Amino acid sequence: MKIKTIKRSADDYVPVKSTQESQMPRNLNPELHPFERAREYTKALNATKLERMFAKPFVGQLGYGHRDGVYAIAKNYGSLNKLATGSADGVIKYWNMSTREEFVSFKAHYGLVTGLCVTQPRFHDKKPDLKSQNFMLSCSDDKTVKLWSINVDDYSNKNSSDNDSVTNEEGLIRTFDGESAFQGIDSHRENSTFATGGAKIHLWDVNRLKPVSDLSWGADNITSLKFNQNETDILASTGSDNSIVLYDLRTNSPTQKIVQTMRTNAICWNPMEAFNFVTANEDHNAYYYDMRNLSRSLNVFKDHVSAVMDVDFSPTGDEIVTGSYDKSIRIYKTNHGHSREIYHTKRMQHVFQVKYSMDSKYIISGSDDGNVRLWRSKAWERSNVKTTREKNKLEYDEKLKERFRHMPEIKRISRHRHVPQVIKKAQEIKNIELSSIKRREANERRTRKDMPYISERKKQIVGTVHKYEDSGRDRKRRKEDDKRDTQEK
């Protein structure tokens, strides 16, 4: 006689440690869970509501800010919590983002600080006593570029309560004099070269007082420039003639040029994809380009109602942040044309500078009200230490929100944002104008059969130019073609 019994092993559900939880037996057969999708939808809806409830993006401002507008911000690529800012009164401040206090400040220039960058420590490898130091380059419309030492240990005895103390010559290493006002500055990642904009692009070496060479390709005035952080010999610049020019320092010459309908205010390279870059334009949009094909943009980032003044990439390479003259900050995913987030405050004025922190968790903005503000890149995220259960719950909620993001109620709640009345009214007027233009083009295309359709990603492009060095084989082939043409004639 056989007797069937139920056998259970305590090893399957009794925890080994006191910190572990008892394992619950689960049967994953879908026939036993007919309401699984309904339960998950409810969880996704609750997670979306909680996300909007906990959305508090503003962290605080750095110190007492500046006395004038903030028009230059530079990240320290070798540190997570250090930042440099420059204002219109010529003062530069170096900040500790952890404590939100300044390390040191300099009365650097007698005019507007137009460019700022924190250099790599290898700048002065020839001098052993300067190997471990950090340096900063600043330029201004007073026709000078200055190299500063920002080694934190040298300023550790500075009185933190004296927030108005500004050093003049302390920390200054070298001054470079130019012939005209400078607009924008950036340093090479691997050597002691740096580039400045203005009437021309000048290449400098920190060990020389005069420029090593200059680059130009028909631009009226260079407004901004940026080195590629991966392909370090590639330099991109924007000009006042609505042009974007790419240079190769290995040949010391320009390679490509694109002309747009309106001026570009800022440019930034993708840190993960060395051939892609994004531009901030006067036409209220930001454009994402591939340097291998500049005849069209990869994406167009819309939603701003005024000129986009600055743009920066997240260190992960999948998001960008823009600051606009409409007094707002927007965050975009690189594969989506509309912003996922908008930040604004009542006191914040025109935003001229935005930067991501090096851990992509925070955003720093500078506006012409003199404040340097710190924001969370994800408004609902908190930086506290989380237990394993909290992490698992947050990851589970993110997957649920991703799965049900197209459901009407979840989509409505996740997209809803409170925006200032001025921006909302401007958006309504802009939408009416754009719809009117589209309707007029549709009517015109109905009567004109030869009217071409121009893609949204090509409308801003007036033309592109390539400038390549001809090899001997190319010249020989061209001569043969010319000879064949003359014979045929």
Swiss-Prot record:
Domain of life, per lineage: Eukaryota
Residues in WD repeats: 65-105, 113-158, 177-214, 217-257, 259-299, 303-342, 346-385
Record Pfam families: Sof1 (PF04158), WD40 (PF00400)
Keyword hit for rRNA processing: yes
Any GO BP annotation: maturation of SSU-rRNA
Functional note: Required for ribosomal RNA processing.
Additional comment: Present with 6620 molecules/cell in log phase SD medium.
Protein name: Protein SOF1
